[in-house]
Amino acid sequence: MSGCLQILTVLLCCRFWALVFSQDQSCCVHHAADIPRCRDACEQLASIRSESRLRHLLHRLPSYCPETLSELWICINNSLPGASRKSDGWVGLGCCELAISAECRRDCKQASSKNDISKVCKKDTENPLYSCITKNEMGSVCCSYAGRHTTCREYCQAIFRTDSSPTVSQISAVKEYCQSVSPPLILCVENYTRLHPTHRPIDSLHCCDRAEEAHCQLACKRILRTLSTEQEIMDGLISECGSQPLPQDPLWQCFLGSAHPPANTDPESPPIAKMDSAKLHCCFKANTSICRNMCVEISTSWGTQSWQEFDQHCEYNPVEMDLITCLADVREPCQLGCKELSYCTNFNNRPTELFRSCNVQSDQGALNDFKLWSNGSIRMPLMNIPVLDIRRCRPEMWKTVACALQIKPCYSRSRGSVICRSDCVEILRQCGDRRRFAEAQTPERICDLLSPTDDPERCIPLNRYLTASELESSVEEVIHPCNPNPCPSSHLCHVNRKGCHVGHDCLPYYCVPGCKLGEASEFLVPADARLQVPVHSAQPGCYEVCVCGQSGRLENCAEMPCFDTSKSCQIAGQRRSHGSSFRVDCNPCSCFAGDAVCSSRQCVRSDSSEEDRRLFTGLPCGCADHFVPVCAGNGRTYPSACVARCVGFTDSQFVFGSCRSFDPCSPNPCQRNQRCVPRRQVCLTDLSEFPCPQYECVSRPSSCDQKLLDPVCDTDNMEHANLCVLNLRGKTLAYSGHCQDACRRPREVCAHNGESYSTVCEAFSERVAVDYQGRCHAVGLESEFGSDSGCNAVPCPPLASDACQPVTPPGACCPVCAGMLRILWNKAQMNIFAKLNRDQPVSLHDILKILRLHVSVPQCDIFGYLSINSEIIILIAPVDQQPTPLQIEACSKEAEKIDSLINSGSPTLVSHVPLSAFLSSELQLSSVRSSSCVSISVCVLLLLCSLILTLTSDL
């Protein structure tokens, strides 16, 4: 533990390292010589001058240099002036040993305030720690009134120094020595003692009934009646009951709960009702009225009712899977990657799998669960399951169960955390103590209630985690900069895709301030985001749109028109409820408040003749696959006038030619003192209500923030820190991002949206992927049944990797290695969002900008376009020119994650405007052939060499 403490001290004080340790490599030479990887990493750190890069690599140093190298860490620690300069006066320092998890304990000892531990020390699992800190904080306030009167201060501090409630003699002593010194101190102490009345041991007698063994229950009651101090009582219970105080043990849970200060029941000052809009989103997914009503009550009036009752009635109710999964998304969103667990080691090194809770706390929780179950009983909200000694009966299987329920792997169609039924039945048949089973209780009946499915996409298959991952290498083909979250508790972590200032190093992530989705919510959204949240009345179908303000609160809320969720859709004689998805022929559809919203794909009828199938183009209205492009008023290029008319545009709403072939600033529509700048966009709202301008008028700025990094490249291939600087210098934008040598000269490409771009950089800048080299000249495939004659003359580029089975996007000619989503959306909702945003149209760029934040792996990026059938097509593809199979798999998993969030209506995604208008999604993935690399060790070796060369060139 001391080694970990030294490591943490180093990480907290990395800015001092640059001043001192960089001049002295003796720590590396003398104490890391036997571990080459550690010595190399240590020496690299010693030579770095960039503080940002130093900080990033320092955070990774423990993965190269284990904490067992205590002399190394002591040496490093001693090289840091100020390493021990934490605030010794922090009142919580004396509480740190009460922390349950080792990581929380370490952070607590290095903290300067409660804010420093909020990310690692969770209030729901570290109750004793936070109760102690709260008590010490109150003591610090009260005793500060003593001023320089040391005797008064000492008697005051004695009241707050122990876990016990203050005794009568302690209170009398404070009054005697402090009454004349400071009446405010007396008043403060009286307020504290009124909130924390003296707790008698016999007040906790009811907790004894929570013990599982009869002899423990009797001993508990005897101890509480005969012993007085809390230490004596705790020692006696540990001795008599034979178990340590684990937080999952119902007996100890009860004692901890009894120690908490009672709620303020003063009728004159009722608690302020706090709202959790994120959880309230989920309440409308409940299938039973009792769970819906309980969910609404605890989401709109936080603190008026415990979640325990809700958990008992709803948490393990199979019919409430949608509700429970939604709440799990809000509490613990699924994230890619898992590593650095010390107990659940088989879950490590899984960079392309999704987990809800891969962290030190859950790792410790799994260990505690296993210890608790070793007592012979598994306590669940609905039942107790008697088991044999699991330390002898399938211990590895039980360890995997404990880890799976704590680490919580996520799967595509259900992100709930239940093990598969067959695993449940197997382990209870072998290790269930049938002599103690309740009447009519069998392994099958237990598992029908707790693990009702064997669908591998809806449950956790234990065999996957009974052995270690095959990816044992630490080489970072796929990294997760934001997992675990490195940012403060009030900030969100975003992947850094902007890069660094020229000549500087930077971290692979950046932190942005956020807002909670309600006073009681833990769910954060980024500043300036527009959110759709339920109204306070919690009436189904009634929402308001708010903005996350700079104050950290939701502001400027405007109510949306309510929609009737009780209305159903009548389709082909069948009734479809609001929010349900279905198909009509080949078209995906969704019912929204009584209206069926469907895509407009062209379908081949089952009774079509061979001639009809031969002539079928897959284009709207059976249009010919001739490429004579027209530019519609929504900013989208369509392959022909026939297609544009068929999808709803009049002849006055389109012109012949592709949209990028026109200069929106000619003639100049701006005022004399303004400059016209092209700003091409594809709008998703009605043109009759919300015009879709392709330019903006900007005034030449007088000055710009050079430190604000959002790089852009001009037509002279000169890079500027941001668009403001480019406009200040009077340059013309070529594309966003750093200038690339590969795009220095024009080389036309055709993108998936049917537009031709001068360079691939221009296409990527508009977040659209490339179909083939050269100017667009063909109508791509719109249907698997359609003719591909238009693509016959197109030379497709080679696939990025021979290892992938590619997908072909709608309207494209060439396949790509990517995960693809085809999203159905509600135009009426888009129009409402535009109306509430000062009549600003909603664009495809707005969609892509938000979705991009949900892609957590830097090796993958998002691209998208509007198909001619008005579906939003999203591609999540590797950014490397020659991606590894693991990177392709990671991109597919990112697409799978977003697809699942859309189809489940998870508030983690659809609370963001305009993503709230999403109805459903169809997923296609690029599968990966495992034979792409002859040997994992060879692949790892090649990648390691590449990494070393890259690091060497950077340094």
Swiss-Prot record:
Protein localization: Cell membrane
One of the GO BP terms on file: regulation of angiogenesis
One Gene Ontology term, aspect cellular component: side of membrane
Annotated glycosylation sites: 77, 191, 287, 375
Site (Reactive bond): 625-626, 706-707
Knot repeats: 28-75, 95-132, 142-188, 207-254, 282-326
Lipid-binding residues (covalent, GPI-anchor amidated serine): 931
Domain (Kazal-like) ranges: 615-661, 686-741, 742-778
Coiled coil: none
Residue segments, region 5 X Knot repeats: 28-326
Propeptide residues, chain positions: 932-955
The keyword Transit peptide is annotated on this UniProt entry: no
SUPFAM superfamilies from the UniProt entry: Kazal-type serine protease inhibitors (SSF100895)
Keywords, sorted A to Z: Cell membrane, Disulfide bond, Glycoprotein, GPI-anchor, Lipoprotein, Membrane, Protease inhibitor, Repeat, Serine protease inhibitor, Signal, Wnt signaling pathway
Record bears the keyword Transport: no
Subunit structure: Interacts (via knot repeats) with wnt7a (via disordered linker region); the interaction is direct. Interacts (via knot repeats) with wnt7b (via disordered linker region); the interaction is direct. Interacts with adgra2; the interaction is direct.
Family from the record: Belongs to the RECK family.
Function: Functions together with adgra2 to enable brain endothelial cells to selectively respond to Wnt7 signals (wnt7a or wnt7b). Plays a key role in Wnt7-specific responses: required for central nervous system (CNS) angiogenesis and blood-brain barrier regulation. Acts as a Wnt7-specific coactivator of canonical Wnt signaling by decoding Wnt ligands: acts by interacting specifically with the disordered linker region of Wnt7, thereby conferring ligand selectivity for Wnt7. Adgra2 is then required to deliver reck-bound Wnt7 to frizzled by assembling a higher-order RECK-ADGRA2-Fzd-LRP5-LRP6 complex.
Comment, domains: The Kazal-like domains mediate the serine protease inhibitor activity.
Designated name of the protein: Reversion-inducing cysteine-rich protein with Kazal motifs
Protein source organism: Danio rerio (Zebrafish)
